Amino acid sequence: MLCVCLKIQINGMYKKRLIVIGGGAAGFFCAVNAARICPDLEVIILEKTSKLLGKVRISGGGRCNVTHACFSIADMIKKYPRGGSFLKKAFHHFFTEDTIHWFRERGVELKTEADGRMFPVTDSSQTIIDCLLKEANRYGVQIRMNRELKQLSAENGRWSLRINEDEIMQSDFVCIASGGYPKMAQYGWLSNAGVEVENPVPSLFTFNLPESPVRSLMGVTVENARVKVAGSKLTEEGPLLITHWGMSGPVILKLSAWGARELAARNWEFSILVNWLPDYNENSLRDLFQQKRFELASQKIANRNPFGLPNRLWEFLLTQSGVREDLRWADLPAAAQNKLIKNCCASEYAVKGKTTFKEEFVTAGGVKLSGIDVNSMQSRKYPNLFYAGEAIDVDGVTGGFNFQNAWTTGWIAAKGIVSNV
């Protein structure tokens, strides 16, 4: 077995070492800031794959949704289904304004879009990647690819790490920034080290509707819909996209995040009720229908869509309600009207399975927050063991919130490590 346990001697003193596990956003942010604040610290990033900053690269359709233009901590923490109370304290150390300022200082300007998401003005994730790689190079951060941590143990006041099958490294400090794993078994090396882990389940996924004819509307987007999980309190509102496999869009992703554990317990098989006109309930929509019967009496219902719904969706709802294409508003039978109102306000669809939303797929679960000091990101149980990013039991909805968690916890971990050097 190859043993790599070098100690660098400077002016008669040994240079302390930090090993960061994970070459993602949180890992890089911890590494480059620790190296910048403490030049005498040897910093090494170990990435188990051959690619660095993978989520940064694909986030936001390749533009990188760096953060969200929310400047109130009280409002920000509402975007995290798990870990909001923890982040309420963490955000006092490093928040949205700090993220914007940090990147601006390094020549990266961010812009805000109408929905609050923030991107580099270049509209390219490569801008963020280049910035982080440049910082790593500037401060001498070593990057080692295809290095998977297999075992972590404390030995003689330092950490011993078994990498791949035949390499041993030692370090004074370790920061776990390995991201989330979808299966508990993948946390084995962490659990074996005595770290308590909350059972992981997927979050931010889309819904499969394999037997639903609504899939024929692939590509149709509704600007605002309300979706409720039947038999549950889970309800969200927002843009909805119909896909060839089912439903996606911000409203579905938010629902999957807030319902991550409940939906996993149902094995991702459940029914949803979609209100395509969330400003109305069945009673108020019935009143509006009566009004339209007079206003549009001579016009064909199929040709006159008074609700602003996409035409393909409107025609689909008419078909599902048994309304003929040539039927006029004045001639709409009461039974057909009631069915159409029901389908507009509470269309029911059977969900059977999920599909990963690759751009922002996260997991609910990870290192239990009760075992982490929020002011340093250090383990309460093991000195000089730190955490950052999605490795901990924090996850946000889509919109830049998971990256803000990465920047914040990476920053706090860097400061916490340096204070112990």
Each PLM stretch: what is its role?
Residues I19-I21, L149, I168-Y181, L190, ...:
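Short hydrophobic core segments
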Residues A35-G61:
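Glycine-rich FAD pyrophosphate-binding loop
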Residues K16-I45, A413-I417:
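N-terminal Rossmann-like FAD-binding beta1-loop-alpha1 element of flavoenzymes
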Residues I37, T49-K51, S72-A74, H92, ...:
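Residue-level recognition of phosphate/Mg2+-coordinating polar/acidic sites
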Residues M145-R158:
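A conserved short coil-to-beta-strand element within the FAD-binding core of flavoproteins
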Residues L87-F95, D115-K134, Y181-A185, S212, ...:
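Short beta-strand to alpha-helix junction loop
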Residues G179-Y181, A185-G188, V394-N420:
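A conserved FAD-binding loop/helix module that cradles the flavin
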Residues F173-R215:
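Glycine-rich loop(s) and the adjacent beta-strand/alpha-helix scaffold that form part
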